[in-house]
Amino acid sequence: MLAKALGRSQDKIVLRTYLLGGGFGRRLEGDYMVPAALASKALGKPVKMICTRADDMRFDCPRSPSRQVLRMAFGDGGRVTAMDHQAAAGWPTAVMAPPIMPKDAHGVPYDPFASDGADHWYTVGAQRVRVLRNDLANRSIRPGLLRSVGPGWINWAVESFMDEGAHAADVDPVAFRLRMLDGAGRNAGSAPNSVGGAHRQAAVLTRVAEKAGWGSVMPRDVGLGVATTFGQARSMPTWVACVARVRVDRISGRVTAEKLTIVIDAGTIVHPDGAEAQVEGAALWGLSLALHEGTEIVNGQPKDTNLNTYTLLRMGGVPDVEIEFVPSTETPVGLGEPATTAVAPAIGNAIFAACGARVRHLPIRAEAVLQALAHRA
């Protein structure tokens, strides 16, 4: 990219990498180097490029819009016999680095960053996953790799749908999931990264339910919601379960997150304090994405370009966060992203438990809660 922009051969380009905080997916795109390099070339001296907040927002590579449709079939005794999941979204790798995309069984390239999470560890009988590229998103907004990437929206759909399935079958949502986390067949896991398979996901789910007081009687308009995940990639799972406690104001539609309880099995924890910090940050990021963050694209530009209108989680909205790591001697796996993906569905499921309003869109705005309440009525 730089060689082409500067008209130089690649062997003349030297990149020096510095440890300067988190990029959270944005630094995987190298486009921001080009204007800095061109300015330096024009001035004949080193240049440090600093964007205004508005320019940074306009120049961003946001998380892709997505749409998902899921179906589930039940057999005798409420047993799940089939599940179908179709997801359409922008494919960030198709924009950033098309040559590295793997090929599917038919030899067609696909983007795992837009499909990870759909190939879950639940035993559901017949299973089909169909992932479609949203070409309009790819052409118009340059979709990026925002922290948690595909599982950030895939697991929102999967775990919200699991909750809906549990209620349709009239089964407790935790028990419903545990029934399918049986470690059968390909869900048994394998060495070195997924030893124990779905049984480890079941273990964190069981533990978080105990820790959060699942099944306790809640005050009016307060609910507990649960979600679980294996993190980013099936080939290197990080087992996470989250219970969210929320309070819903039926008049305003406002949702207040009161507590997040999270249990994680990430194999051997090498640096406990660093591990806890990663999970805290990931969980609060997930909460911000669940309840606050989002904008519209108007005439090809983001509508909200500064923090006066682009809403974020603020300190006053930070709930109690309780984290527990499962003692393990298994292979260490990633911790930067997995907890992000369990929070939003846990929040959505808690809203339903609190007031019966089922929300299916992120972020969860007060208006959407009021609409869901009205629809329920």
Q: Over which residues does each language-model region extend?
A:
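Short acidic, glycine/serine/threonine-rich loops at helix termini
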Residues: 1, 24-30, 58-64, 84-86, ...
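Alpha-helical support elements that line or immediately flank enzyme active sites
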Residues: 1-43, 100-119, 145-194, 200-203, ...
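Short beta-strand elements
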Residues: 2, 67-76, 82-87, 126, ...
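Beta-strand segments within the central parallel beta-sheet cores of soluble alpha/beta enzyme folds
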Residues: 11-19, 45-54, 81-86, 124, ...
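Active-site phosphate-binding and catalytic loops of NTP-dependent enzymes
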Residues: 52, 212-219, 294, 298
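Glycine-rich loop/linker segments at domain edges
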Residues: 65-160, 312
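Flexible, glycine/threonine-enriched loop-and-boundary segments that flank and lead into catalytic domains
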Residues: 221-245
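Generic long, charged, amphipathic alpha-helical segments
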Residues: 310-334
